[in-house]
Amino acid sequence: WFSKNKPKVTTTKLKNGTLTKDPFKNSILYVTQKNFKFIRSKGMLSPFKCTFDVIVMYNKTPEAEFWGIEFKTYRKLKASNFDKMEKLIKAEPMWREMEDFIVMVDGQRLQSETISFDSEKNTTSTTRESWSGGRAQFLLEDFEEIAKASTLDMRYYGLNTDSQFDLEDNEVLSIKGLVAAALAD
């Protein structure tokens, strides 16, 4: 009963990203990504710094099909004792959990759905590692508008008003480039 032709998960490196086909889940996932170091002056820890992984993706499952721009953050805090760690955690801005991500193409907001990721934490009395973020999901025709846009603006919304920020021109252009690369694959 062992078949030479049994289905298996395949991963293919394309020109700009990676395509994974899973016959067991009947799913297709395409991913291309870039690492950004965001430095902003808002928040109680000023200026705050964080590394964002920006992932442009296509995902097709029996339940859904979408194109997306995903933000993942990682942060490690260190303190000499528990009390100092508690103060650091309280001062950490709420921007790391994405509540909304707005893309404006030629002055018009693109229709999208935002999914927030639950924070994952690994904490001891002197260190705290955490991961967070979210994803804006688009239909193909709206996603294509990003690559064709003559003017493009993007705004990230975290969980409070201190956590909103506009992406700078070079960051927007990098994401536009990732979108174009994904569509080209």
Q: How should these model regions be labeled?
A:
Residues 1-185:
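A generic "folded-domain core" signal
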